[in-house]
Amino acid sequence: MLQVYLVRHGETQWNAERRIQGQSDSPLTAKGEQQAMQVATRAKELGITHIISSDLGRTRRTAEIIAQACGCDIIFDSRLRELNMGVLETRNIDSLTEEEENWRRQLVNGTVDGRIPEGESMQELSDRVNAALESCRDLPQGSRPLLVSHGIALGCLVSTILGLPAWAERRLRLRNCSISRVDYQESLWLASGWVVETAGDISHLDAPALDELQR
């Protein structure tokens, strides 16, 4: 059975400021660095063999801290990037016009083909993050990979494994540096393929962490 761990990046400056990041970037805060060190300690205990990360700066930094603890190299995969939020990237949520807020809410409330202008649809996001996960099946037998990605991206991935459409209402809370686990297995009692073992574990963190809807 292949076990794949999923980690959201540490808290960033724009998370704390409630600004929309998408594929734009801001650095980890001091708290985010601490969260990454705490998840790194947990990852070392899990026997991680490979670290595969989104190539955006906030995930790169989180992955670097984890890799140092685990003694692993990092593979960067752009398919693990966050949802492209188009014209709303870098904007403070509280500054959005009514029309702009409606664009953003489409992605939260489950609108088929919802899309921010110049951004991605949830289906496009789902296609690429699921392809990145599927690539883990090509790793050597006995591998235990850890993927470092983003809140909406990982939420979409876990939700689609559970059988929900990519655009379904967002009802999964994945806080900064939370750990989820998905397994690929053949089972008599569960559907064969990917199954969700855990989602959003923050027991390794010593302080409250932000979820995507609190940014």
Swiss-Prot record:
Protein origin, superkingdom: Bacteria
Residues given in the record as substrate binding sites: 8-15, 21-22, 58, 60, 82-85, 104-105, 151-152
Enzymatic class: isomerase
Alphabetical GO biological process terms: glycolytic process
Residues annotated as the enzyme's active site: 9 (tele-phosphohistidine intermediate), 82 (proton donor/acceptor)
Site (Transition state stabilizer): 150
Pathway assigned to this chain's UniProt record: Carbohydrate degradation; glycolysis; pyruvate from D-glyceraldehyde 3-phosphate: step 3/5
SMART domains for this protein: PGAM
Keyword Nucleotide-binding set for record: no
Similarity field: Belongs to the phosphoglycerate mutase family. GpmB subfamily.
Name the record gives this protein: Probable phosphoglycerate mutase GpmB
